[in-house]
Amino acid sequence: MGIKVKVEFLGGLDVISNGVREHKCEVPLEEGEATMIDLIKYITATIISDPKDVPVFIEEGTVRPGILVLINDTDWELEGMEDYVVESGDVLTFTSTLHGG
């Protein structure tokens, strides 16, 4: 049994997932709860298409600075960041705020 969530990559961040902006996922859950850290591990293992792109998304075990993270349209800083317990039906949006020029 897993947790069904929608993961979105916006602001050009979709390049790390073969240009796919929206992913409907079922995150495996053996027991207990899944936190955002578990979801981040799931994303790096299953959604990011090229391992060389992981540093575009992750730095020091968490989402890189410059990527806005929303949980159900609320800034993840207000939701507990990595400690947020992911629930079925959640929409998790990752938006790059850094753009080339």
Swiss-Prot record:
- Output this protein's name: Ubiquitin-related modifier 1
State the gene name recorded for this protein: URM1
Which taxonomic lineage is given here? Eukaryota, Fungi, Dikarya, Ascomycota, Saccharomycotina
Subcellular location, principal: cytoplasm
Give the source species.
Answer: Debaryomyces hansenii (strain ATCC 36239 / CBS 767 / BCRC 21394 / JCM 1990 / NBRC 0083 / IGC 2968)
Q: What does this protein do?
A: Acts as a sulfur carrier required for 2-thiolation of mcm(5)S(2)U at tRNA wobble positions of cytosolic tRNA(Lys), tRNA(Glu) and tRNA(Gln). Serves as sulfur donor in tRNA 2-thiolation reaction by being thiocarboxylated (-COSH) at its C-terminus by the MOCS3 homolog UBA4. The sulfur is then transferred to tRNA to form 2-thiolation of mcm(5)S(2)U. Prior mcm(5) tRNA modification by the elongator complex is required for 2-thiolation. Also acts as a ubiquitin-like protein (UBL) that is covalently conjugated via an isopeptide bond to lysine residues of target proteins such as AHP1.
Q: Which residues carry this modification: 1-thioglycine?
A: G101
Which key words are in the record? Cytoplasm, Isopeptide bond, tRNA processing, Ubl conjugation pathway
Where does the record put the Glycyl lysine isopeptide (Gly-Lys) (interchain with K-? in acceptor proteins) cross-link?
A: G101
Keyword Cytoplasm attributed: yes
Q: Which domain of life is it from?
A: Eukaryota
Where is this protein found? Cytoplasm
InterPro entries, sorted? Beta-grasp_dom_sf (IPR012675), Mopterin_synth/thiamin_S_b (IPR016155), Urm1 (IPR015221)
Q: CDD domains under this entry? A: Ubl_Urm1
Q: List the disulfide bonds.
A: none
Q: Which family does it belong to?
A: Belongs to the URM1 family.
* GO BP terms, alphabetized: protein urmylation; tRNA thio-modification; tRNA wobble uridine modification
A Pfam family hit = Urm1
One GO cellular component term: cytosol
Kindly provide the PTM information from the record: C-terminal thiocarboxylation occurs in 2 steps, it is first acyl-adenylated (-COAMP) via the hesA/moeB/thiF part of UBA4, then thiocarboxylated (-COSH) via the rhodanese domain of UBA4.
